[in-house]
Design a protein with these regions (language model features):
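Extended intrinsically disordered or low-complexity regions, especially N/C-terminal cytosolic tails and loops
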Residues: 2, 10, 15-265, 277-358
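Acidic/aromatic/glycine-rich contiguous surface patches that form carbohydrate-binding/processing clefts
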Residues: 273
C-alpha cells in the first residue's frame, strides 16, 4: 500500500490517487505504474467524491532507454517514419550546426495529427528547416522591437515616478500594492545591482555607501525587463501609471501592464532561442480596447497566439518611432516564406486589411 507521504508526492491537479497493492505491481513483468487517478470535483478531495463514470487514467513513470544516434542513423530513422529529403548531405551539414532536438520542434508541424513520429505524405526535411530559419529571423525582428519598447518604458518609469516619489521610490513599501512582491522585487534589485559590471554602478559605490542601492535612474538601467515589469505592475500609484500609459497612446495602465507582461514572456523565449512562430503564450494582452492610434478588429483574433503580440508591438512602435519599418519587415519576412501557415501564428483572414497594417 502506498504511504501518505508517497500519495502527497503525486502530481497535483490530476485527480486523487488510488492506492495500489504491492502484489498487483509485482505481478507486472516491468512495473511502471505510479498510481491510478479518477476524476474528482477537486484534486484535494477524497476519492469518495469521484464522479461515477468520470474519466480515470494511469499516471506512469518509465525508464528512459533511448540511445544517442549519429547523423546517418537520425536520417535513417526519419526516413523510416515517412520523412523525405532533397539532399541528405545538406541535411547532415545542418544537423551538425543545429541540434536534431531543436529541429524536431519544427518537424512536429509535418506529423500526422494524433500519431507521434508519423509524417504526412510528401513532407520534406527541408520544409522544417525553412520553418526553423523563418522562426530565427522572426525572433530577431521581434527582439529588436521589444528592445526599443523596453528602453522607452524604462525611461518613462524612471522619469515620471521619480518626479512624483523621489529617487528611491522603489525602496518604499508604501508604494507597493503587494508587500510580499515588493520584498521579492527589492531583494532581486539588490542582487542585480551588485552583480552589475557597469562602470557607473561601480563608481557609485566607490563614492556612496548610503542608501545601499543607487538612485532609480541608475538602478533601473541595470535591472532586467522582467523586474521592471514587476515594479511597474506592483506600483500602487495608479495616477502615475495612467500617465505613463497615456504617453504611450494607451487608454489606461491595465492595458499597458498586460502588454508588457506578454513582451517579457516573448523576450524570454527569444533569449533562450525557443520556437515562437506557433507557440501558445500563457500571458494574453488586452486587445478589445479603444485606442487612439490605428488598431485591429479583435473579433477573430486568438489572444494567446503570436499575431496578437505582434500587433501590440507594432502599435507601440508607431507611437515610439513614427518612421519605423517594423510592420514592413514583418510583411517582407512573410512574403519571403510563403509556405508558413499563418493560421498557426494566429493571423486572421485579411489581416493586411486592418487599419494597423495599412
Amino acid at each position: 500500500m502506498r504511504t501518505a507521504a508517497e500519495r502527497k508526492d503525486c502530481p497535483k491537479g490530476r485527480g486523487y490517487p488510488l492506492d495500489l497493492h504491492e502484489k498487483n505491481l509485482s505481478s507486472l513483468h516491468n512495473p511502471k505504474i505510479l498510481c491510478i487517478f479518477a476524476a474528482t470535483d477537486s484534486a484535494t478531495l477524497p476519492i469518495r467524491t469521484a464522479n461515477q463514470g468520470g474519466t480515470s487514467f494511469l499516471y506512469t513513470f518509465m525508464n528512459y532507454t533511448k540511445q544517442p544516434l549519429d547523423y546517418h542513423q537520425i536520417i535513417a530513422q526519419l526516413k523510416s517514419r515517412g520523412l523525405l529529403f532533397h539532399n541528405e548531405d545538406v541535411a547532415i551539414s545542418q544537423l551538425q550546426i543545429i541540434s536534431y532536438f531543436r529541429i524536431a520542434n519544427y518537424l512536429k508541424s509535418f506529423e500526422v495529427v494524433g500519431f507521434n513520429h508519423v509524417f504526412l505524405p510528401n513532407s520534406y526535411f527541408e520544409y522544417a528547416l525553412d520553418l526553423y530559419y523563418f522562426d530565427k529571423k522572426l525572433r530577431n525582428l521581434l527582439f529588436s522591437a521589444i528592445q526599443s519598447i523596453e528602453v522607452a518604458l524604462r525611461s518613462k518609469v524612471i522619469h515620471n515616478v521619480s518626479l512624483r516619489h523621489g529617487a528611491f521610490w522603489f525602496t518604499d513599501i508604501r508604494l507597493a500594492t503587494n508587500h510580499a512582491m515588493f520584498q521579492d522585487n527589492l531583494t532581486q534589485i539588490k542582487k542585480e545591482v551588485r552583480r552589475s559590471k557597469e562602470e557607473f554602478i561601480q563608481e557609485h559605490f566607490e563614492k556612496y555607501d548610503s542608501p545601499d542601492v543607487p538612485p532609480v535612474w541608475k538602478t533601473l538601467e541595470v535591472t532586467s525587463f522582467g523586474l521592471l515589469s514587476k515594479l511597474f505592475c506592483n506600483l500602487s500609484d495608479n495616477k502615475v501609471k495612467k500617465q505613463i500609459a497615456r504617453e504611450l497612446n494607451l487608454p489606461q495602465h491595465l492595458c499597458l501592464e498586460s502588454w508588457v507582461k506578454c513582451f517579457v514572456v516573448l523576450r524570454n523565449c527569444i533569449a533562450h532561442h525557443a520556437r515562437v512562430w506557433n507557440r501558445r503564450f500563457p500571458q494574453i494582452p488586452q486587445l478589445n480596447v479603444n485606442l487612439r492610434g490605428k488598431w485591429i478588429s479583435t473579433t477573430h483574433v486568438r489572444p494567446n497566439k503570436l499575431y496578437a503580440i505582434i500587433c501590440c508591438l507594432a502599435y507601440l512602435q508607431d507611437v515610439i518611432h513614427s518612421n519605423n519599418d517594423f510592420k514592413q519587415q514583418i510583411q517582407n519576412l512573410l512574403e519571403q516564406y510563403p509556405n508558413v501557415n499563418l493560421h498557426h501564428m494566429g493571423f486572421p483572414r485579411n489581416w493586411q486589411d486592418e487599419p494597423l497594417w495599412k
